[in-house]
UniProtKB/Swiss-Prot annotation:
GO terms for biological process: isopentenyl diphosphate biosynthetic process, mevalonate pathway; sterol biosynthetic process. It comes from Ganoderma lucidum (Ling zhi medicinal fungus). This is Diphosphomevalonate decarboxylase. (R)-5-diphosphomevalonate binds at Y19, W20, G21, K22, R75, S154, G155, S156, A157, C158, R159, T210. One of its GO terms (molecular function) is ATP binding. Pathway: Isoprenoid biosynthesis; isopentenyl diphosphate biosynthesis via mevalonate pathway; isopentenyl diphosphate from (R)-mevalonate: step 3/3. The keyword Phosphoprotein does not apply. It catalyses: (R)-5-diphosphomevalonate + ATP = isopentenyl diphosphate + ADP + phosphate + CO2. Diphosphomevalonate decarboxylase; part of the second module of ergosterol biosynthesis pathway that includes the middle steps of the pathway. The second module involves the formation of farnesyl diphosphate, which is also an important intermediate in the biosynthesis of ubiquinone, dolichol, heme and prenylated proteins. This module also plays a key role in the biosynthesis of triterpenes such as ganoderic acids (GA), a group of highly oxygenated lanostane-type triterpenoids which are well recognized as a main group of unique bioactive compounds in the medicinal mushroom Ganoderma lucidum. The gene is MVD. Induction: By methyl jasmonate (MeJA). InterPro entries: GHMP_kinase_C_sf (IPR036554), Mev_decarb (IPR005935), Mev_diP_decarb (IPR029765), MVD-like_N (IPR053859), Mvd1_C (IPR041431), Ribosomal_Su5_D2-typ_SF (IPR020568), Ribsml_uS5_D2-typ_fold_subgr (IPR014721). It comes from the Eukaryota.
Length: 400
């Protein structure tokens, strides 16, 4: 008997121009366009296996081995239903295709990083879900069209259907058909963009993004200014910076937009605080590092950005990443040795230090554990279809 199964992985993306606020909460249509960098799946990814079988009684999903309820009308159910509908269209056109759109599916998904740690697990998770179902159903659908479906699971998931540098175009139509992701440039266009993720807190956050952003839409006058007057110009400017590989402009816009996102969180009633003292100290370090860089070269060398949580992501060209790691480790000593995937430091490991001319008084040193971990990664590719040896379901259709 045929086994209808496919496995795919999808990447994490970290926004430079932030998505914050929905104009339609059911369809997940944003109040503004956004732009992100896709990170390397060799370091951060969600992997998902989907199987369709006539013996399955209902659609079921397991995340990191624990079953998650698929609520009727919920985001998971919506994505699965939309993907089944695309498969049914194929079957209706070609009588020779097996009618697997009518079968229930079992889906098993794993992240190789902590879920809800402020690393965008919902984005990579829903992108991997859509990618695995697209492979299972052998859909000829374009990535942009698939991104419309991923968007209905988690807004930022639509951006994880591409590698490199990705825009989520907010669209204008009320049905959301023009709210989708497009690639601004592939990974190969600017491969030397590296990222250092500073994991400040790997617990669940206090205010979820979904609840927080709608409170901002309802109460923040600053958000309305941002949507109308700030984001459109920044989207154009950062897209141009990416196309011309202008890191100075890319960094400046990325930091400005992170700052404004946290300003609209603060402008919300009651205010929302995602950053903590450690987050703010990392900003102070990068600002001072850049001050020295501008003095010497006239250009910025690093960009911080923060999503809805305290974790910092620092973008920098490959040639400067070593200095950035040394700087962070000097102020935030690590309990465990730095995992050095690119072999920057050799057997001796990383020693904390600052660059010449750096004013060390910009922040106090913190104790071990203030930054719980450092993840060094780089710009990466889009979803990958994996072989059966990487499947997460056993022959009985339950998680391995």
């Amino acid at each position: 008997m045929s086994v209808y199964q496919a496995t795919a992985s999808a990447p994490v993306n970290i926004a430079c121009i932030k998505y914050w606020g929905k104009r339609d909460t059911k369809l997940i249509l944003p109040t503004n366009s956004s732009l992100s960098v896709t990170l390397d799946q060799d370091h951060l990814r969600s992997t998902t296996t989907a199987r369709a079988d006539p013996s399955f009684q209902k659609d079921r999903l397991w995340l990191n081995g624990t079953e998650d309820e698929i609520k009727d009308g919920g985001r998971l159910a919506t994505c699965i239903k939309e993907m089944k509908a695309l498969r049914k269209q194929l079957e209706d056109k070609d009588a020779s295709l097996p009618k697997i759109s009518s079968y229930s599916v079992h889906i098993s998904s794993r992240n190789n990083f902590p879920t809800a740690a402020g690393l965008a697990s919902s984005a990579s998770g829903f992108a991997a879900l859509v990618a695995s179902l697209a492979a299972l159903y052998k859909l000829p659908t374009s990535q942009s069209d698939l991104s419309r479906i991923a968007r209905q699971g988690s807004g930022s998931a639509c951006r994880s259907l591409f590698g490199g540098f990705v825009a989520w175009q907010m669209g204008e139509l009320p049905d959301g058909s023009d709210s989708l992701a497009v690639e601004i440039a592939p990974r190969e266009h600017w491969p030397d963009i590296h990222a250092l993720i500073c994991v400040v807190n790997d617990e669940k956050k206090g205010t979820s993004s979904t609840a927080g952003m709608q409170r901002t839409v309802e109460t923040s006058p600053l958000l309305q200014h941002r949507i109308k007057h700030v984001v459109p110009a920044r989207m154009a400017a950062i897209s141009a910076a990416i196309r011309t590989r202008d890191f100075d402009a890319f960094a400046r816009i990325t930091m400005q937009d992170s700052n404004q996102f946290h300003a609209v969180a603060l402008d919300t009633e009651p205010p929302i605080f995602y950053m903590n003292d450690v987050s703010r100290a990392i900003i102070a370090l990068i600002v001072e590092y850049n001050r020295v860089a501008v003095e010497k070269t006239g250009k910025l060398k690093a960009a911080y950005t923060y999503d809805a949580g305290p974790n910092a992501v620092i973008y920098t060209p490959k040639e400067h990443i070593k200095e950035i790691v040394e700087l962070i480790v000097k102020y935030f000593p690590q309990a465990e040795n730095f995992k050095d995937p690119f072999g920057l430091f050799g057997a001796a490991g990383v020693q904390g230090k600052v660059v010449d001319g750096f004013n060390e008084a910009v922040s106090k040193p913190f104790g071990v554990g203030a930054v719980k971990g450092l993840i060094h990664t780089r710009v990466g590719d889009g979803p990958r279809t994996l072989g059966p040896e990487e499947a997460l379901l056993s022959p009985d259709g339950l998680p391995k």
